[in-house]
Swiss-Prot record:
Binding site for K(+): 224, 243, 245, 248
Protein name in UniProt: tRNA modification GTPase MnmE
Free-text function comment from the UniProt entry: Exhibits a very high intrinsic GTPase hydrolysis rate. Involved in the addition of a carboxymethylaminomethyl (cmnm) group at the wobble position (U34) of certain tRNAs, forming tRNA-cmnm(5)s(2)U34.
Localization, UniProt: Cytoplasm
GO molecular-function terms, A-Z: GTP binding; GTPase activity; metal ion binding
InterPro entries for this protein: G_TrmE, GTP-bd, GTP-bd_TrmE_N, GTPase_MnmE, MnmE_dom2, MnmE_helical, P-loop_NTPase, Small_GTP-bd
Length: 450
């Protein structure tokens, strides 16, 4: 529920720094700031002044007043740029609270910007994405969403969809007309155009979601197959201990890297085998649990006979664990230690040949990983997307397919109903129709000062 009281929070990261910013927003923001500074503040002017708690000077700094509606939140906003010492910033916050403000909830400044139509929901989410971006590519894509690229795509779709709905519903409302609107080629062409556009947005959304969420890779295999060496090769540094002793990795080893700007969460697991060692057995249990969370499994093997590759299936190599691996997770067989072979086979299907120790084939493996999730570096128009966006687009796509079926069958009323459902799913992306629960969940994931 939107309350128009005045909120305050520190807008800069925790810890010491050269500058710390306290942000105030609400109807009393200006009067509180003028009490703190004992100055008359002009809109959009940087005023250098002392900051007081009644008559005691807390600090001095620059204060800027942004009057409504020309501010980030759409309300009166004041930003106090003081020295970046947490104790000083807390004193300023304390004085602000005494003058009638309250502490802001997580994401409340951006929530107010959304509720005051300064941002739509995809742009509001992009604020968090640009702050939390873990790669340059993710940051650039979040900036595209923030400037409205994603919203424009959805709004253009909605405009076409609403026009088509009007046309279809007109044919239902005026049955006395001799013209059969449903046989009009314009409807077929328009519906096909919407179908194709939703499919394009669906593909872009999935790539954008990868930039936000990243890809979780699990390294699985028998002991001493070279999983830890592969982790180090992918990470470009020594993250895991590598020895010739089987079972060296007894716990989960995690590494966060980027491949062509895509965040990768790589998890090296204990070698899968039956073991009487209590510690190793616990590591294997944790490995099995982590496998359930994977986007991809890299099954590392060095299964060679007489310098020839053995194309054994995962269920043959680790039969006692195979039934615990989810069937819907993609598995890539990474044949390690190819430097031991006289002749190296060509990569094919889900079989990639590498030498983690010699760094042979690592770039090919990286390309394979990205290709498996449908990510392409050639797409310069990717904007960041959330899992909820992907779900909404998937639902919209399912119902636009049903709409096409109803058009072919000549069922005007069912066609109109399917188009309405598509519209509702698209509206949920930009926040045209969103429940309070959904908004609360989205904005609670923000940092306090945003």
């Amino acid at each position: 529920m939107y309350t128009k009281d005045t909120i305050v929070a520190v807008a800069t990261p925790q810890g010491n720094g050269g500058i710390g910013i306290v942000r105030i927003s609400g109807s009393d923001a200006l009067s509180i700031a003028e009490k703190l500074t004992k100055k008359r503040l002009k809109p959009r002017y940087a005023t250098f002044c002392n900051i007081y708690n009644i008559n005691e000077i807390i600090d001095h700094g620059i204060v800027i007043f942004f009057n409504s509606p020309n501010s980030y939140t759409g309300e009166d906003v004041v930003e106090i740029q003081a020295h970046g010492n947490p104790f000083i910033l807390n004193l300023i916050i304390k004085a602000t609270l005494e003058y009638g403000a309250r502490m802001a909830n997580a994401g409340e400044f951006t929530e107010r910007a959304f509720l005051n139509n300064k941002l739509d929901l995809t742009q509001a989410e992009a604020v968090a994405d640009i702050i939390n971006a873990s790669s340059e590519t993710a940051a650039k894509s979040a900036a595209k969403s923030l400037q409205g690229d994603f919203s424009k795509e959805i709004n253009n779709l909605l405009e076409k969809l609403i026009y088509l709905r009007m046309y279809v519903e007109a044919s239902i409302d005026f049955p006395e007309e001799e013209i059969n609107f449903l046989e009009d080629q314009k409807i077929h062409n328009s519906l096909q155009d919407i179908y194709k556009t939703i499919l394009d947005v669906k593909n872009s959304c999935k790539q954008g979601a990868i930039l936000v969420e990243g890809i979780t890779l699990i390294l699985v295999g028998k002991p001493n197959a070279g999983k830890s060496s592969l982790l180090n090769a992918l990470a470009g540094k020594e993250s895991a201990i590598v020895t010739s002793i089987a079972g060296t990795t007894r716990d989960i080893v995690k590494e966060h890297i980027q491949i062509n700007g895509v965040p990768m969460h790589i998890i090296d697991t204990a070698g899968l085998r039956s073991s009487d060692d209590i510690i190793e057995s616990e590591g294997i249990k944790r490995a099995i649990k982590k496998i359930q969370e994977a986007d991809q499994i890299l099954f590392v093997t060095d299964d060679y006979t007489n310098s020839q590759v053995k194309f054994s299936d995962i269920k043959d190599i680790i039969p006692e664990f195979y039934h615990q691996i989810p069937k819907d997770i993609d598995i890539t067989y990474v044949h390690n230690k190819i430097d031991l072979l006289k002749e190296v086979p060509l990569n094919h299907d889900n079989h990639i040949y590498i030498s983690a120790e010699s760094n042979i084939g690592i770039d090919k493996l990286k390309d394979h990983i990205l290709a498996k999730v449908g990510y392409t570096t050639q797409n310069e128009s990717i904007y960041t997307a959330r899992e909820r966006h992907v779900t909404a687009i998937d639902n919209a796509f399912d119902h636009i397919k049903l709409a096409k079926e109803q058009l072919e069958l000549g069922n005007g009323e069912l066609l109109a109903e399917e188009l309405l459902i598509v519209q509702e799913h698209l509206n949920s992306i930009t926040g045209e129709f969103s429940s309070d629960d959904l908004l609360g969940e989205i904005f609670s994931s923000f940092c306090i000062g945003k």
